[in-house]
Amino acid sequence: MTTHNNNFGAGAAQMTLIGLRYLSARKLRTALTTLAIVFGVALIFAINLVLPSALSAFQLSLSAVSGADIHITSTSGEAFAPETVLPSLTALDSVRAATGILSRQFSLPGLTADTAAQITLIGIDPAQTVRQFAVSEGRFLQEGDTGVAVFPAGIAELAPELAVGTTFPLVTAGGLKLYTIVGFLAEQGNPSAPEIYVSLPDAQSALNQPALINTLELALVAGADRDASSASILQTLGDGFQLNAPAGSSSILGALEIGLALFNLLGLLALFLGAFLIFNTFRTVVIERRHDIAMLRAIGATQRQITQMIVIESLVQGVVGTIIGLVFGFLMAWAGVALMGGIWETYLNRGTLSLEVNLSAVAVAAGLGIVTAVVAGYLPARSAGRTSPLEALRPATPASVQHAARWSLIVGMGTMLLSVGLLLFTDSNGAATGALLFLTGMLIAAPSLVLPVARLFSPLLTLWFAREGDLARGNLVRQPGRAAITASTLMIGLATLILMAALVISFGDLVRKLADVNFSSDILILPPTIAVYDAVVGADPALAERVRALPEVATVGTLRYAAASTPVTDLQVLGIDPVDYPQVASFEFAGGDAESIFAALGSGHNAILTSIALSTLNLAVGDDLVLQTPTGLQTYRIAAVGNDILSFKVAAMFISQDNLAADFHKAEDVLLMVSLVPGADNAAALAGVQTILGDYPQFTGQLTGAYREELVNVTAGALDLFYGLAILILIPAALGLLNTLTINILERTREIGVVRAVGGSRGQVRRIVTAEALLLGIFGAAMGVFAGVAMSYGFILAFGAIGWEMPYTFPVMGVIAAVVIGVLLALGASILPARSAAQLDIIRALQYE
């Protein structure tokens, strides 16, 4: 037994040594294969550094400096009546004191010269029963104070002219209001979102939340067990409350988390293509080393040792590629944060964006990189280990190659026919499956298509390359499996490009369609951020009344906001007036007529859900939806599914403004839409609106037509970024082409020597390699076009499952770009291998083994 183990250990060491020597002897191939892992790991690592850093910066900007032991908020983050919970909390033995505060973080125009700054307005009880405030200058708030504020010392960095006794303008729901500064805190506070303290009644008035709070602060008795106290407090509160979570801003957090998931999918796709490249490389390596493997088997190497040798090679490349990828990923993340920092602070005002390295990001990227390399190398390794010595020494016969190609054609065509049936004759739920099946069928059928494609384009190559084209075709069809896998790598990249092109076109059409349907007003009164209303100070009904009083105005429709939670997801709850709103805007309804739907909204607890909300909650029209609100559990009946341009990308629901006020205590208008009387002068009406908005600097007025065009153009510009992402996906495809051509040169070294020995010039050898690369590029581009069209059609139909009925537009420019890029990639990838082949020494090439 000991002897057997020693022999096994010695054999494993020998196989490891042979594998390492093989990698070191073929440096270019090893480097190209390793680069695929480097790229995928770097992309995933960078994404998992940048977006979590953004999440962390955002969450930090929400956190107030506090000496309280425990914070309590509603699960929705909305304000609630303190008398519903305060008496039961103060009765607990572990609670020394409790107080309510009302806070909101929002953008404050004019705090700095260049941009609006982010501040946190906090209304508190001046009694300081829970935490103490040290003042460095002036005094703190006192009982009965109104119209006064206390600022943090760090405010001097933003507005050095402020001093005790000066006045400061704050935006409120009732318009701009001046507050007198009575003191500065000793603490610097959060410099990215300074905390301004006012009395609780002043905050309730400023935020139009009379007699409400959104946070309870608790101080525990000395020596109380924090965990036990927290459990007791939660039990006392019941459902609808949470401990130590910042109030509000769930919409931005959700958007950042969705962005993290989407970009991770991009990184995984890049890593998948890298795995495809490694699989192709090791499959080719096994074919090239058939004689070496046969000799090793003949002198006693076991199947396990052969498999082990090739797996070790893939493991080494995976480890090296992962280490290099982590370094490059960190550099990419550092550059990304540097580029995003200015935009983050200028437009989001959500803290300072800085790069944070976390072990989970390292572990995820490293684990995926190493595991991907080993898994991709294992299948060729197992195939090599199962090869007998005689089988390895025997060259593949044309009959066996044709037999394998025949079966790949039958299975591949059958899979593609099934996918076409799913694409054409099923609903949106089966469309994505059909698209993926078509791609799978193309991958399976690819080896059988090598010869027909080579014959089809051979006359074209003959025109460009004369006799070299025939030699290139022969080289390609000699190993159809290798050519198919290489072309398939290119196919996936080009299909992704076509898919992106189709999605950009169709999504742009959807946005334009929704904009035309929804924006039927003449003037829009807009908050600083659209569709993310957590950090918006709206206006009380007085603003809408003042606008209605203008002689040019016919109707004013308003939008109000609240947040709600369900066991499945958080929801935006938007309040509209069922009578006024249809006169200034509408929805893209998925069934039913608008008049009856709006009528239902005005009676009882009925709601319109966006398609995203409906699919996320897995509900249907007519079902009941139970929401956790500041007033407890409320049940709403789903009256319809409707999308509008501002909320179709989020989980949102629309209810009447009466229900919003009763269930959520919200009566702020966060967006106003104005329709003018026929024949009114738009410019004059806008001027009148802007005069009124001088008292409400948190809003801006714009003509609806101009804003519609701006929104469509901004969306189109943002969608164009997806083309850049698709180009990134093509990098592994280019590496695959370069790798395959390089391996072909090494495998055919003696053959190239013979060509040179019988009179072939260096230029002819170079043209042979270029022609072969061009054939591979054309083959991959052709498959990419078919796969890309099928995938784009299927995935666009699949969006119907979440209610996005996007029209399919054939991506003509995407197809043309894919073909051109495929050919250019092939020609570019051929430069180095062609030069290497042309420079081979004839004598050494003939002696090569």
Predicted segments — roles?
Residues 65, 180, 184-222, 518, ...:
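Small-residue transmembrane helix packing/gating motifs
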Residues 316-348, 360-386, 414-426, 447-458, ...:
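Small-residue-rich transmembrane alpha-helices
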Residues 1-13, 17-21, 25-32, 261, ...:
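Alpha-helical transmembrane segments, especially those used as permease/efflux helices
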Residues 57-58, 232-272, 287, 309, ...:
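Peri-transmembrane interface segments
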Residues 47-48, 83, 91-92, 96-144, ...:
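The feature marks short, hydrophobic/small-residue-biased sequence motifs that occur predominantly
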Residues 34-120, 164, 228-235, 483-572, ...:
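Hydrophobic, regular-secondary-structure patches
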Residues 27-52, 257-294, 315-329, 367-375, ...:
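Hydrophobic alpha-helical transmembrane segments of multi-pass inner-membrane transport and secretion
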